[in-house]
Amino acid sequence: MEQFKQIGNKAIRQIGYGLLAIWMLCGCGNKYQYIPKDIEPISIDIVRFDNAQLGVRPDSVKQDIKKLYDDYESFMPIFVEGILGIPTEDTAYLCEMYAQFLTDTAMGFAQTNAKAQSLFANIDSLQETLNMGFTRLHHLYPDWKIPTLYLFVSGFNSSVMYYEDIVGVGIDMYLGSKYPYYNQVVYDYQKQTMRKACVAVDVLSMYLAYNIPYNSKYNRLLEQMIFRGKQLFLLSQLLPDEPEWELIGYSKEQWDWCEKYEKAIWNRIMEKRDLFKTESSVLSSYINDGPFTSEVTQDSPGRLGQWVGWRIVDSYMRNNKKVTLHELMNEND
């Protein structure tokens, strides 16, 4: 956005306050469509590596793992080293750990593997949502390579990973926010997004994060907010049927809290003069995930800085209808 180019502390303060004031007056709810509906559809390839990996038999682990390497030569090394953390050349240790991964009940691996296969037996809805999202993204950025999606079971090690033209999803991390074995591996606030319905949002969010770099000379909170806000705004255009709270990873109650107290949130940010701070502790509090946003109040959800940034960008776009998505994403904050 032209207003947010680096033009000095005093000027950016005045402009920043002005834009935030516009946000407070105008609210949110951009329904303007920036991507036409009648575009050529594409289909993203989804590889069911999970079915193959769980087809390994405890009494023939060595042979079955070799077959996985033969059948999935591009992904198997990524899975073994990147997800399981086992050197590919250490086949004896890999076989030992893999047998435990298949049969262990104390850590819940065996139960979780079965639950994952049952819950993700049908992925038609996921396929449809991802097809729509990547179709719309491909219309905007036709030169971007559409990734191949691999589903796998990670032993609670990974939710979404990205490597070159591969996106991987650990489906065992999306078994529902009340899945009992999550109590052993994550904090309560993280469970909100550990649902099957969150997979498509997480995949597209990861893809955007890797393909749209953050560039800022000063790395102030306001610039971080705007950058995250632009990503969320673009995501809302890729998945227009998704509720706003799902896009940011909030519950409906958390979203409603933010809307109810948005003026108080803004007043708190202004009182603390946080907009132009660069301290990592301040940026982390507002931007990174957590049980709450400590710089505001313990009653708040985490990542309030992302929510505020989205509101700012949404307000900007509703008041500047001639600005295209390309122009928005290419602006320096």
Where is each model-derived feature located?
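C-terminal motif of bacterial Sec signal peptides marking the signal peptidase cleavage site
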Residues: 25-27
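Acidic/His-rich structured neighborhood in mature extracellular/periplasmic domains
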Residues: 97-255, 326, 330-333
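Extracytoplasmic/secreted envelope proteins and their assembly/folding machinery
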Residues: 43-46, 131-134, 231-235, 266, ...
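N-terminal secretory signal peptides that target proteins for export/translocation
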Residues: 1-10
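C-terminal soluble interaction/assembly domains
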Residues: 277-333
